[in-house]
Regions:
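Short loop/turn and low-complexity linker motifs enriched in small/turn-promoting residues
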Residues: 22-150
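Bacterial N-terminal signal peptides that target proteins for export
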Residues: 1-10
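Alpha-helical transmembrane segments
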Residues: 13-16
């Protein structure tokens, strides 16, 4: 009976350690981070921010794509910012599941997407959700900019 209890607590401790560890992802420069946090979109472009402001599931980097092209990976407290042509765009987040979000962007506007991390069966899951500018700016401010492939 005691052995079973210790095995249970040992397994639980291991799972908590894995779920709360920190993934390392390539980071953008401090200047790029500061520029993105000015939250100004170019008049002829749209800005898309994807942020992950939670530490939960931090041991697992999550792959993100924009319009079917690999953008990179997020870790805990990181974000991407992309300047894109106005129009239809699809963001995907790949973890234990694949979450997608379609945006129809307009020139001169910024869009904010929260990459929520949830408990999965074997590893964390993600859920992409568009949020309002106030919520998005606050979330991005809590994060550092990750290096993107574009």
């Amino acid at each position: 009976m005691k052995t079973t209890r210790y095995s249970f607590f040992g397994t639980a401790l291991l799972l908590v350690s894995i779920m709360s560890g920190c993934a390392s992802v390539p980071m953008a420069s401090g200047d790029e981070d500061a520029k993105a946090k000015s939250f100004t979109a170019a008049a002829d472009k749209s800005s898309i921010y994807v942020y992950r402001n939670e530490s939960f599931g931090g041991a697992i980097p999550m792959t993100v794509s924009l319009d079917g092209k690999l953008a990179g990976q997020t870790g805990p407290k990181t974000y991407f910012m992309w300047e894109v042509e106005p129009g239809a765009h699809e963001i995907a987040s790949i973890a234990e599941n694949t979450s997608t979000l379609k945006l129809n962007t307009k020139a001169g506007k910024a869009y904010y997407v929260w990459q929520e991390v949830k408990m999965g069966l074997w590893m964390p899951r993600s859920l992409l959700q568009e949020v309002d500018a106030g919520t998005g700016k606050k979330g991005v401010a809590e994060c550092k900019r990750a290096q993107s492939n574009f």
